[in-house]
UniProtKB/Swiss-Prot annotation:
Species the sequence originates in: Sinorhizobium sp
InterPro entries reported for this sequence: Aminotransferase_I/II_large, CobD, NHTrfase_class1_PyrdxlP-BS, PyrdxlP-dep_Trfase, PyrdxlP-dep_Trfase_major, PyrdxlP-dep_Trfase_small
Role description: Decarboxylates L-threonine-O-3-phosphate to yield (R)-1-amino-2-propanol O-2-phosphate, the precursor for the linkage between the nucleotide loop and the corrin ring in cobalamin.
Pathway where it operates: Cofactor biosynthesis; adenosylcobalamin biosynthesis
Top-level taxon: Bacteria
Gene name linked to the record: cobC
E.C. code: 4.1.1.81
Stated name of the protein: Threonine-phosphate decarboxylase
Self-association and partners: Homodimer.
Subcellular location(s) per record: Cytoplasm
Upper lineage: Bacteria, Pseudomonadati, Pseudomonadota, Alphaproteobacteria, Hyphomicrobiales
Amino acid sequence: MSAPIVHGGGITEAAARYGGRPEDWLDLSTGINPCPVALPAVPERAWHRLPDRQTVDDARSAAADYYRTNGVLPLPVPGTQSVIQLLPRLAPANRHVAIFGPTYGEYARVLEAAGFAVDRVADADALTAEHGLVIVVNPNNPTGRALAPAELLAIAARQKASGGLLLVDEAFGDLEPQLSVAGHASGQGNLIVFRSFGKFFGLAGLRLGFVVATEPVLASFADWLGPWAVSGPALTISKALMQGDTKAIAAGILERRAGLDAALDGAGLNRIGGTGLFVLVEHPRAALLQERLCEAHILTRKFDYAPTWLRVGLAPDAAGDRRLADALARMEL
């Protein structure tokens, strides 16, 4: 098995290395809404009992409306990482996997560990009939690159002709619903869409995601995960929040993103990509920049495969923006 990937987060470890209390650090290392929404009331029975069929069906129905799946009832899963781990069972055997990259590293790690030949490709021109599974994160993490639905559906059609699959990870898609292909999964036949619940709502600890695909694919994932894969409280919370008005959540995220942009621009940093939930910065001394920010007890995300890149997430408030701006202003790199 390959070595684990170092992801965002890890405030406790950072504090142990650079000092300070974890609660005093400013965590800008993730792509998670830093202003979690207020939790709806969860009935005691959701904690006391195993989730029943009605609870699951209600959450799936709410997800179908929220993700505009055109009749498909999305499968709730305990975080999309849980189904990434299952992809070696789904990917056509003895064929290559193509991953549009650079992107979220767990796809390549899991599939290569299972013995698949993984080709990292820049665009659809690199795809061949050898690719049994094509993976696109859209919008992409960490670059923010976005493919239009027409481009993705063209790839899906090409894959279908060669007996292959297309997986589109829309983990950061809540703020850009016009990019989603979730509504095409039932008609396309070979299209699978992953959606993340926790990033937009600021509830990553809930460990909840959804899969949109044909019924046979959903049945396979459900069988591999086993019964009661998602907790009753998670299902109850997701139903309530997806049925609520999310406009204020989106507006709050965009306001926080504007504050981050201002702090980075004020320091003269080069923004080269991102989504509503993070910015990708290019700097010739990105590793040193990350180190200096850690010394100021501000955590960001660097990338071993791209030493000039730094991903910066959103601060929870204007005070966090000022703290970042002040730390950058004091730096000599």
